[in-house]
Amino acid sequence: FIDGGPIEIEGKEYTLRYGNVELYSNDETPFEVQAVIYNLNRGRVTNRFSFTLPEETKGTAQYWCSEAYQQTDNDIVDKSFSQNFEGYIGIGWAVDPYSGRAYAAIDVCTLDSLNRDPSKNYAIGFIVKGREGQRIDAFAMGDSLSLDSYGREGWTDGSCNGSVSDMCTGKQTLCVGAYTSTDSWAQLDGFAYSLPEAGLTTGHVAPISSYGTLIDGRNLPHVL
């Protein structure tokens, strides 16, 4: 599922999702992407927005939206979407000219509907269908979006694996990361301080350190 961050409007907390999720195939083979609305209470998909990636649609996108966000005649105003969210979801695809890999992008800007209480019963997710043996990696904009299974079976949690910068991926580049040696530190006032919400785990990769397994199998960083 695509998770966002909290925003307060008129004393109520809503979830704002804004940014892109990009999906890369391991080669030029197209695949199918579905953005979905999922009822967390009932445990089922309530609506699907499907976009296949045949050659004739390469370089194009399709948007589904609430009425106030319609920009062109091609945008589809969807009543089911509008019942639970304000905003839009768009899906498009192309072939990366540098790597030759097929990729798709989910462009999302949604806010829980202001016409009902922010019960958070509905989530936005995506389903990918590829061919046998095909590998597809998904990357979310980490400053505004995250990927979460919400504890539902059959869905996948996101991770920071793959967050390493492309500047570190050169074959003659030494990539140095960081690990957590302690979860608290002393200050000049004589007290020790910690930051529990930062996710610091002694002996593990630090949250500020990117890492990942590249498509050619290399694991970065080289040094922690």
Outline where the language-model segments fall.
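Loop-rich non-cytosolic ectodomains and luminal regions
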Residues: 1-224
